[in-house]
Amino acid sequence: MRKISTFDLYPGMVLGEDVLNFDRQVILSRGTELTDSFISRIELNGVLEVYIEEAAEEVPPPPEGCNADYAPRHPTYADRIKNSPDFKKFKEEYNQITSGFKFKINEMVDKNVEIDTKELLKEPLQLITASGSSSNTLDMLHNMRDYDDLTFAHSMNVALLNYVAAGWLNWSEADKELAMACGLLHDIGKLQISHDVLTKPGKLDNTEYKHIQQHPVFGYKLLKDRVNVHIMNSALMHHERYDGTGYPLQIKGEAIDRFARLTAISDVYDAMTAARCYRGPLCPFRVIEIFEDEGFDKYDVQFILSFLSNVGNTYVRNGCVLSDGREGEIIMLNPGKLSRPVVQCGYEYVDLSKFPDLRIETLK
């Protein structure tokens, strides 16, 4: 049995220890065989690493880009995006900007260099402008998953998502840019976590576990009196949950800074949509379904419904393939079940909310 990053999990692995959330509640039991849904649940609860039985590690993952349940039978929407000139240009600029961001952040932490948020925002804002629209930004991020340093790429993704999501909420341009800055710096505290703790091969003791839980506090202290208060609060509160089940303060509702409430959604969404060794990025409607299954009580309802409905609306009039192999076009969302829209297959209209065993497999 050994510890493995959540990012490296794939279906078929068997848990060697119970998986706990930050309230120390069991979310999956030892001996559970992982499925795509279970992996998403682990990610949704912000768990960074789990223990896997040694025997399970020898099971080879399915081919890259293949879902464990459904092997793609058609060229996907993601394939078209990745092969487009716009994506190739975005990818090149994204990698350059993220590398520059990494250098600047390390200087801020290691050399106590002044934090100039306006300077930090210049290039990410250019990237947003170059993508052309919120839907294009989502498409690019869903497929932009091979940057070497995941910590910094994740922060860049959350920044871009925050900007788009703030626009959906009709926030002012100044607040949209502030939300972007909150995303860029929300995880800066991870740079203060002991390397020995992060790489420890054995089980973490309670002291070490609490040390990891303190990364929001470390981030807050790094940023205190150096940046806007909302940026400080987003570093401190992005793991807080609306129902009070988060950490480190276990505050709830409106006591959580509104920028942190938005950052929490972008943070989890980016983690769930990341490609894995056994599959490409999750279909957006699958991600929406995971949020629905886990419940909305952990997030600001206005923010999460705006976020998910706008993600869904991005793909209305898009082609798709259903899990039974039929091809169709997404016609409209179901407000009460955003993950299950109405799909037109030929002359037939299929309301997925009425067919629990049927889902959108891929976009095309």
Spans of features found by a protein language model:
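Terminal helices and disordered tails flanking the catalytic cores of nucleotide-processing hydrolases
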Residues: 1-111, 115, 281-364
